């Protein structure tokens, strides 16, 4: 067994909820290490929709996923968190007691952590795209076939075919329309699950001749060396080729919770039940914040994860500093907090 990394808190997941938890913990002099299976911070915001606008973050009329992540990283910089990317938590050992919990965490990369608290901020777990059943599609992935839009510039002046009928398909149809050479939206029927205003906007573009809507299913691909030239659509009137340089199938995501499912956390439909006072699980010292948790009235919003992290930090302090009284302070008026943030 290698030498363990000793820290106050291990945070599983470096999405917005996990990042903001670092801030709230840092204000209380609590050190943290973050572990994430992705290669960079930001979770779904950075991995699935870095350039997609978000409209319900307080104080930001509009901010895209990557901008939000960048701002969170700047906000937590004074607390010098340590990140461990490309790793999954494989095993958790409970070492302490309910009154004085402690844990040993093992990762897929062979690292070992010992901490007093574990905060699970893993979103929905590890998300993997559902792939369309098209023979040979793997040969075009990462060059011409994408399951998420990470850089809009990759689609500029291209013939883009988007497949799907939900919010992601419609949102990216509308967002990419101004820069793509031509957008074709493909859905198996003329009935969409997306927000009505998005569907109406799409239909207006189709009626004006600015994009195409085709009904049917993509059955094969044309191209070579990973570069698409066309897709074959099978509809009610037979098969037809559609010019295509970028194919974006939005068939949804599958969620894999992974080893967290074996931690004895009384899972409910792959979510972790918590109390709403401190967002602690049934295991003392293990907290869950963000989309991974569930409780009556839960809203899966980024701002909910921020709120949950702030309240969780108060209880975490009791575990990390059991003999130290916590006095609540405001960053607007506390000189000690401002000193931690480097603003005075």
Swiss-Prot record:
Query: How the cofactor binds, per note?
Result: Binds 1 FAD per subunit.
**Secretion signal, residue range per the UniProt entry:** none
GO terms for MF: ferredoxin-NADP+ reductase activity; flavin adenine dinucleotide binding; NADP binding
Please give the cofactor(s) recorded in the UniProt entry for this protein. Answer: FAD
Catalysed reactions, semicolon-separated: 2 reduced [2Fe-2S]-[ferredoxin] + NADP(+) + H(+) = 2 oxidized [2Fe-2S]-[ferredoxin] + NADPH
What the entry lists under PANTHER family is as follows: THIOREDOXIN REDUCTASE 1-RELATED-RELATED (PTHR48105)
Protein's UniProt name? Ferredoxin--NADP reductase
Give the source species. Beijerinckia indica subsp. indica (strain ATCC 9039 / DSM 1715 / NCIMB 8712)
């Amino acid at each position: 067994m290698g030498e363990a990394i000793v820290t106050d808190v291990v945070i599983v997941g470096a999405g917005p909820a996990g990042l903001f938890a670092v801030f709230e913990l840092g204000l209380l002099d609590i050190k943290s290490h973050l572990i994430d299976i992705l290669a960079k911070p930001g979770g779904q915001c950075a991995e699935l929709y870095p350039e997609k606008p978000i409209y319900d973050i307080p104080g930001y009329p509009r901010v895209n996923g990557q901008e939000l992540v960048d701002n969170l990283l700047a906000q937590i910089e004074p607390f010098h968190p340590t990140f461990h990317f490309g790793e999954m938590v494989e095993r958790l050992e409970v070492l302490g007691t309910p009154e004085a919990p402690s844990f040993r965490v093992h990762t897929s990369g062979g690292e070992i952590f010992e901490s007093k608290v574990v905060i699970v901020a893993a979103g929905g777990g590890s998300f993997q795209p559902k792939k369309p059943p098209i023979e040979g599609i793997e040969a075009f992935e990462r060059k011409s076939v994408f399951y998420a839009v990470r850089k809009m510039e990759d689609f500029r002046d291209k013939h883009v075919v988007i497949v799907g009928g939900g919010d992601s398909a419609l949102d990216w149809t509308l967002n990419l329309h101004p820069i793509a050479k031509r957008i074709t939206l493909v859905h198996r029927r003329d009935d969409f699950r997306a927000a009505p205003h998005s569907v109406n906007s799409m239909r207006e573009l189709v009626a004006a001749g600015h994009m195409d809507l085709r009904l049917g299913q993509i059955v094969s691909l044309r191209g070579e060396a990973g570069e698409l030239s066309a897709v074959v659509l099978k509809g009610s009137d037979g098969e037809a080729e559609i010019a295509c340089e970028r194919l974006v199938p939005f068939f949804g995501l599958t969620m894999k919770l992974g080893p967290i499912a074996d931690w004895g956390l009384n899972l409910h439909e792959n979510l972790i039940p918590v109390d709403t006072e401190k967002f602690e699980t049934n295991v003392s010292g293990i907290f869950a914040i963000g989309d991974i948790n569930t409780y009556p009235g839960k809203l899966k919003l980024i701002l909910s994860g921020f709120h949950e992290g702030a309240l969780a930090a108060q209880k975490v302090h009791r575990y990390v500093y059991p003999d130290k009284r916590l006095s609540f302070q405001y960053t607007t008026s506390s000189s000690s907090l401002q000193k931690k943030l480097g603003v005075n």
